[in-house]
Swiss-Prot record:
Region described as Reductase: 147-396
GO BP: cellular response to nitrosative stress; nitric oxide catabolic process; response to toxic substance
Residue span, Globin domain: 1-136
Cofactors, names only: heme b; FAD
Residues that bind NADP(+): G268, V269, G270, Q271, T272, P273
Lineage of the organism: Bacteria, Pseudomonadati, Pseudomonadota, Gammaproteobacteria, Enterobacterales
PANTHER family documented for this protein: FLAVOHEMOPROTEIN
Species per Swiss-Prot/TrEMBL record: Yersinia pestis
Protein name in the entry: Flavohemoprotein
Family, per entry: Belongs to the globin family. Two-domain flavohemoproteins subfamily. In the C-terminal section; belongs to the flavoprotein pyridine nucleotide cytochrome reductase family.
Length: 396
């Protein structure tokens, strides 16, 4: 526990941190990578280049300083980060490195005096212990469960299938022929990629897209125009190739009782965690109403359309509505899609007709912000709204 003086000193630095902004974490990462370039094998350098990771870390530091007297308020954030850390194989020995360069950054940017540096060192130590303990639990759980493993395991690509012009799916089976760890629908896999074209090892997280089956995993990857790893996966990796995988992780997953109505809302590749949820609801013969709402540019980039249609034909409690922003001439209204333009939920009165309904959504950030506002405007309780950000987390 932190003493009152330490807490007071840390809280007194909040205005300084806020005024500095992500410049703080930019300096931190530059310093840490200079002294420990091997950590570039862990961190997503694309997120470093875009500034997303710097912003996410800055927000986390400010949230910790603000809630330092009430760490319980940070537990959801701790869980989300711990899940990601274990997908990246973060170990206890990494925390002193981060702490050293965080304190050095504060000193170099602000020269706040030894009392402030000591207070932040204590505060960081407490937070590091929280993460180390939780991550140890996650590692141990995934190692001891049926089909589980602790860090990395070799998987063979047994099926590669083009699902749209930009999305490709990969079915993965353990090279050792054993079972695979159960996962919660909505969680992701960490994929470790080493290739002659890459300067460093790259790690990416991709959502699982089927119901758990104990034998294989399926992920789907969107080919981004400037995406180093996504283009490599699409163009270079083929059936028979081996990839190393961390166990399923993630704090975004389907968690409802059999009588709970569910709305699954997505845009683009954001449908991938929803697809796992839909397949699971179907396999479990979920009795309550399920709504599938999806937005895509057009049929050329609408992945898994046939799979969802096949489920809808066998699942009478599933309602499906698809929006195409700019349909092609070959896209059939009423068959391939139901509405043209952007997804608009304002006229869907059923959204709020059942106080038990839970809402899960994923997609590009502007889409999620728009959907979040629409749900809240219809009086949906925030605790029944669940969302996933691909990449560093953002509050919508």
């Amino acid at each position: 526990m932190l003493d009152t003086q330490t807490i007071a000193i840390v809280k007194s630095t909040i205005p300084l941190l806020a005024a500095t902004g992500p410049k703080l974490t930019a300096h931190f990462y530059e310093r840490m990578f200079k002294h420990h370039p091997e950590l570039k094998n862990i961190f997503n350098m694309s997120n470093q280049s875009s500034g997303d990771q710097r912003e996410a870390l800055f927000n986390a530091i400010c949230a910790y300083a603000t809630n330092i007297e009430n760490l319980a308020a940070l537990l959801p954030t701790v869980e989300r980060i711990a899940q990601k850390h274990t997908s990246l194989n973060i170990q206890p020995e990494h925390y002193p490195i981060v702490g050293e360069h965080l304190i050095a950054t504060l000193d170099e940017l602000f020269s706040p005096g030894q009392a402030v540096l000591d207070a932040w060192a204590k505060a960081y130590g407490v937070l590091a212990d929280v993460f180390i303990q939780r991550e140890s639990q996650i590692y141990q759980q995934s190692e001891t469960e049926t089909g589980g493993w602790r860090t990395l395991r070799r998987f063979r690509i047994i099926k590669k299938e083009q699902q749209s012009e930009v999305i490709c799916s990969f079915v993965l089976a353990p090279e050792d022929g054993g079972q695979v760890l159960h996962y919660k629908p909505g969680q992701y896999l960490g994929i470790y990629i080493e290739h002659e074209s890459l300067e460093f090892q790259e790690i990416r997280q991709y959502s699982l897209t089927t119901a758990p089956n104990g034998k294989t995993y399926r992920i789907a990857v969107k080919r981004e125009e400037q995406g180093t790893v996504s283009n490599l996966l699409h163009r270079e990796l083929n059936e028979g190739d081996i990839v190393r995988i961390a166990p399923p992780r993630g704090d975004f997953f389907l968690d409802v009782s059999p009588d709970t109505p569910v709305a699954l809302i997505s845009a683009g590749v954001g449908q991938t965690p929803m697809l796992s949820m839909l397949n699971t609801l179907y396999s479990q013969q979920h009795a309550a109403p399920v709504h599938w709402l999806h937005a895509a540019e057009n049929g050329r980039v609408h992945a898994f359309a046939d799979e969802v249609s096949a489920i809808a034909a066998k699942m009478p409690n599933l309602s499906r509505h698809v929006w195409y922003r700019e349909p092609d001439l070959q896209d059939k209204h009423g068959e391939d899609y139901h509405s043209q333009g952007l997804m608009d939920l304002s006229s869907y009165q059923w959204l709020a007709d059942d106080p038990k309904r839970h809402y899960y959504f994923c997609g590009p950030l502007p889409f999620m912000q728009f959907i979040g506002r629409q749900l809240l405007a219809q009086g949906i309780a925030p605790e029944q709204i669940h969302y996933e950000c691909f990449g560093p987390h953002k509050v919508i």
